[in-house]
């Protein structure tokens, strides 16, 4: 099972938004590039980086930070506002091969095929709030059955997703793995669980679900709990494959 540290960027800084709300932003006095470098040195093979400014405001204010982080692009899965062919190509030219996409794929599933054509590994971000699928930086939501949606997207080459429980994101509440487990088994896709991976108990549960799904629960993404030292690097490494 992979344990993936998460770094969100907003206003050029490392940040977390509680439940995805801009007014609930927490900023951290950490240098993004130094943080990524240290994590790689600690042995983490994948880091989850999301540009919240691009996702929510379609702003490229964080692009200079993404350029700095491109030194470590092979270890990063990048997301946030990837809604156009041009922007996806721009990131790919910086070396970002794993790209997290959502809204554009909901509008045009063939975007997945385009990404593969430019040698990108697309990871679909399935964000749910109260059973509804959310998109456009979590500002909009729709009554869509997640399982049916994923089965349809598999026809366009979808293989891997991040499932985020928005109500738990940044709250330090525990992730409910029941829906994540159901998605992995019924849609038969590789899943990273996010939102509420907030304690060692979360990691223990994830490890159990990883076994129950025969590895379809590929890993977990740890944000605020990591940034605030609630889940230490040592503990996360203990559960990482």
Swiss-Prot record:
Which Gene Ontology cellular component annotation is one that this UniProt entry carries? cytoplasm
> CDD domains from the entry?
HisA
Q: Which InterPro entries match?
A: Aldolase_TIM, His_biosynth, HisA_bact_arch, Isoase_HisA-like, Isoase_HisA-like_bact, RibuloseP-bd_barrel
Give the record's GO biological process terms: L-histidine biosynthetic process; L-tryptophan biosynthetic process
Record keywords, A-Z: Amino-acid biosynthesis, Cytoplasm, Histidine biosynthesis, Isomerase
E.C. number(s) listed in UniProt: 5.3.1.16
Location in the cell: Cytoplasm
Q: Which Pfam families match?
A: His_biosynth
Q: Which GO terms describe its molecular function?
A: 1-(5-phosphoribosyl)-5-[(5-phosphoribosylamino)methylideneamino]imidazole-4-carboxamide isomerase activity
Catalysed transformations (reactions): 1-(5-phospho-beta-D-ribosyl)-5-[(5-phospho-beta-D-ribosylamino)methylideneamino]imidazole-4-carboxamide = 5-[(5-phospho-1-deoxy-D-ribulos-1-ylimino)methylamino]-1-(5-phospho-beta-D-ribosyl)imidazole-4-carboxamide
- Active site: residue positions: 8 (proton acceptor), 127 (proton donor)
Could you say which protein family the record assigns here? Belongs to the HisA/HisF family.
User: What name does UniProt use for this protein?
Assistant: 1-(5-phosphoribosyl)-5-[(5-phosphoribosylamino)methylideneamino] imidazole-4-carboxamide isomerase
Q: Which organism is it from?
A: Thermotoga petrophila (strain ATCC BAA-488 / DSM 13995 / JCM 10881 / RKU-1)
């Amino acid at each position: 099972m992979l344990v993936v540290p998460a770094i969100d960027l907003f206003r050029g800084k490392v940040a977390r938004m509680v439940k995805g709300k801009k007014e609930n932003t927490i900023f951290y006095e950490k240098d993004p590039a130094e943080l990524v470098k240290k994590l790689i040195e600690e042995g983490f093979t994948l880091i989850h980086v999301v540009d919240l400014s691009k996702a929510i405001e379609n702003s490229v204010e964080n692009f200079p930070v993404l350029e700095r982080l491109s030194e470590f692009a092979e270890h990063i899965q990048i997301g946030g506002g990837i809604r156009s062919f041009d922007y996806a190509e721009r990131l790919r030219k910086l070396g970002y091969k794993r790209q997290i996409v959502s809204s554009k794929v909901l509008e045009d599933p063939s975007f997945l095929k385009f990404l593969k054509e430019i040698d990108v590994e697309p990871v679909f971000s399935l964000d749910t709030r109260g059973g509804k699928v959310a998109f456009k930086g979590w500002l909009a939501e729709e009554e869509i059955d997640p399982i049916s949606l994923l089965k349809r997207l598999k026809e366009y080459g979808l293989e891997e997703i991040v499932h985020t429980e928005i109500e738990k994101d940044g709250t330090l509440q525990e992730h409910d793995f029941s829906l994540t487990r159901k998605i992995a088994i019924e849609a038969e896709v590789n899943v990273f669980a996010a939102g509420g991976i907030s304690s060692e108990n979360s990691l223990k549960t994830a490890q159990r679900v990883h076994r129950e799904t025969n590895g379809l629960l590929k890993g977990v993404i740890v944000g605020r709990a990591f940034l605030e030292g609630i889940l230490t690097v040592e503990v996360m490494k203990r559960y990482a494959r």
